[in-house]
Amino acid sequence: MKLGVVSDTHDNLDSVEAAVAYFEAEAVDVVVHCGDIVAPFSATAFDADFDFHAVRGNNDGEWKLREIVESFGTYHDDFAHLTLAGEEIAVYHGTEAGLVDALVEAGSYDYVLRGHTHERVVEHDGETTHLNPGGLPIAGADDDFHVAVVDLGTGDVSFEAL
């Protein structure tokens, strides 16, 4: 099973559409958005040929966002615990770094997916992979928008600059 991971798209429809096109080309089965979609209009592009899950980011205050996402996917509020292909996956935006660390260090999850920092991360702590796909570029960060694809069968993680 292939899992697409995206975060911090902040209403940039061009980036959202590029991410969706990439995920479809890679034939991912599920896409997880780690928060900061922001407005409902930019969520609708994720209504595509994959299952979709999203958590709330610190900029996701638009009250219609849940309704729009729920029309084609699942909106999990601040945290999601998913089981995909036998893998236990925690999804949290990452606003509180201490909570991210606790999720990783607990050893209860195969993957901890997060966003917020707009910086790509893939780290392994015991049996847990901590993954941040990055996000729209911010000052001092990489200049490219990235997404990630995880092969849940092999554990391989790849990043793609869009």
Map each language-model feature to its residues.
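N-terminal active-site segment of His-dependent metallophosphoesterases
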Residues: 1-45
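Active-site neighborhood of phospho(di)ester-bond hydrolases with catalytic His/Asp-centered motifs
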Residues: 6-7, 31-36, 53-58, 91-93, ...
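Active-site environment of divalent metal-dependent phosphoester hydrolases
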Residues: 10-14, 38-41, 59-65, 96-101, ...
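Short acidic, glycine/proline-enriched helix-loop-strand junctions
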Residues: 43-53, 127-130
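Helix-adjacent hinge/juxtasegments
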Residues: 51-94
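Binuclear metal-dependent phosphoesterase catalytic core
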Residues: 77-85, 107-108, 124, 129-162
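Internal catalytic-core helix/loop-beta-alpha segment
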Residues: 79-119
